[in-house]
Swiss-Prot record:
Present with 468 molecules/cell in log phase SD medium. Belongs to the proteasome subunit S5B/HSM3 family. Involved in DNA mismatch repair in slow-growing cells. Acts as a chaperone during the assembly of the 26S proteasome, specifically of the base subcomplex of the 19S regulatory complex (RC). This is DNA mismatch repair protein HSM3. One of its GO terms (biological process) is proteasome regulatory particle assembly. One of its GO terms (cellular component) is cytoplasm. The keyword DNA damage applies. The gene is HSM3. Disulfide bonds: none annotated.
């Protein structure tokens, strides 16, 4: 950003400070606050401005026992949120000392508490408050069922997430506060329990193996069964384990699997036992299916964990009304290995099978089990939107693209036929068609062979509204 533009923002902030210090707040003060907030995102620093006086002025409003009806406190907090990261944190501490932050968090003024969280979130170094009771107070507020201010809860969660990259903060959370966290977990009160699950989900991404504590991050069979009494709590618990497994895969935290493997079958048992636990199927089928999908991606010992859950409880293929969901969600490598007959017998190309196709085609062996279900005649009988959904799916992988290019030239003709680009007005159809063209072009000229030029020409018409010509390739690439 230019010096001129930076000066403009600094002048706006100076104007804001002056107007906030007037005896009577101007009528347009909220407009100015909003203007400052919007412009602060355009700068990375304020080199010629001392922000302490403005922060002190804002602090005066937040700590005042008088509530100013004409002042939008959300806008005021937004300015604090953007201003604090730009300031030297030593300067911030001159205005908001550690003692001030403690007083703010213990006050009855929610905007002041939120402002304190914004300051704490940006502390430098991040472990600055690890030896103070500030972290303890944040946890007390977070798990207080009487606290109903969503903005405050969000501010606390955001602050803890930002600071938890620091090992000292994590020690404060899970060593000093372990007995307290265990007590929150043990009472299983809906509000605090759901917040605890959200908190643990956030924290797990930062936890290393030696830091992991089963007593707080894992749940017993008894706790899971008790959670069914409040189906919302049970759903949160299911989602927690789903995110837990996803984090294991995404962050390569396979050391954590041994902590949860024994308890995961309990969810499958509850799913099966509709007689004793009817609410589980009635209200949590979708989230449970997502959990089972994640378990099916644990490849350890030839999918032994999911294979056992499948054999003992889920029984994929035995319940006709769930086959679609299984084929849409479960790891296609597992399906083709252990339920190839279900895949071959149930999948058919239609507008209703797009979700299944997207999942099954993600594995080459599984796709080979269904490729004989395709023919140009079957695909071309579909409405054009559904044609494009099928084609777009077939362009996602090398092996499916090769099948489309070599085995279904008539379908390719429908994709790049004369006038297609200009004739389509439905935005969803345009999206899938353009995505299919782009996916194929990404395979490169050599693999596309004779299809390359017509695909490039059609994509140019779709994106630029004109035919491709020499020199336009850069423009096409820029639009992709």
């Amino acid at each position: 950003m230019s010096e001129k533009e930076t000066n403009y923002v600094e002048n706006l902030l100076t104007q804001l400070e002056n107007e906030l210090n007037e005896d009577n707040l101007p009528e347009d003060i909220n407009t100015l606050l909003r203007k400052c907030s919007l412009n602060l995102v355009t700068v990375v620093s304020l080199p010629d401005m001392d922000v302490k006086p403005l922060l002190a002025t804002i602090k005066r409003f937040l700590t005042s026992n008088v509530s100013y009806d004409s002042l939008n406190y959300d806008y005021l907090l937004d300015v604090v949120d953007k201003l604090v990261p730009m300031a030297d944190f030593d300067d911030v501490l001159e205005v908001y000392s550690a003692e001030d932050l403690v007083k703010a968090l213990r006050s009855e003024i929610d905007p002041l508490k939120v402002a304190a969280c914004r300051v704490i979130e940006n502390s430098q170094p991040k472990g600055l408050f690890a030896t103070s009771n500030i972290i303890d107070i944040l946890l007390d507020i977070l798990f207080d069922e009487k606290v109903e201010n969503d903005k405050l809860i969000t501010a606390i969660e955001k602050a803890l997430e930002r600071l938890s990259t620091d090992e000292l903060i994590r020690r404060r959370l899970f060593d000093n506060n372990l007995p307290y966290l265990v007590s929150v977990k043990g009472r299983m009160e809906t509000v605090s329990f759901v917040r605890l699950i959200d908190f643990l989900t956030i924290e797990f991404q930062f936890i290393s193996g030696p830091e992991f504590k089963d007593i707080i991050f894992c749940f017993t069979k008894e706790e899971i069964l008790k959670s069914v009494e409040d189906i919302l709590v049970f759903i949160e618990l299911v989602n927690y384990y789903t995110k837990f497994l996803l984090e294991i895969r995404n962050q390569d935290k396979y050391w954590a699997l041994r902590h949860v493997k024994k308890i995961l079958p309990v969810f499958a048992q509850l799913f099966e036992d509709t007689e004793n636990y009817p609410d589980v199927r009635a209200f949590s089928t979708n989230c449970l299916l997502q959990l089972f999908a994640e378990v099916s991606r644990i490849e350890e010992d030839e999918y032994s964990l999911f294979k056992t859950m499948d054999k003992d409880s889920l029984k994929i293929g035995s319940e006709a009304k769930l086959i679609t969901e299984w084929l849409e969600l479960i790891n296609p490598q597992y399906l083709v290995k252990y339920h190839k007959d279900v895949v071959e017998n149930y999948f058919h190309v239609s507008g209703y099978s797009i979700g299944m196709l997207r999942n099954l085609s993600a594995d080459e062996e599984c796709f080979n089990a269904i490729r004989n279900k395709f023919s140009a005649e079957i695909v071309l009988r579909l409405p054009y939107l559904e044609q494009m959904q099928v084609v777009e799916t077939l362009t996602r992988y090398e092996y499916t693209s090769k099948f489309l290019l070599n085995e279904m030239p008539k379908v390719m003709g429908s994709l790049i036929g004369d006038g297609s680009a200009g004739a389509i007005i439905d935005l969803e159809t345009v999206h899938y068609r353009n995505s299919a063209l782009r996916n194929l072009l990404d395979k490169g000229e050599e693999k596309l062979s004779v299809w390359y030029e017509p695909l490039l020409r059609e994509y140019s018409k779709a994106v630029n509204g004109k035919n491709y010509s020499t020199g336009s390739e850069t423009k096409i690439a820029d639009c992709r």
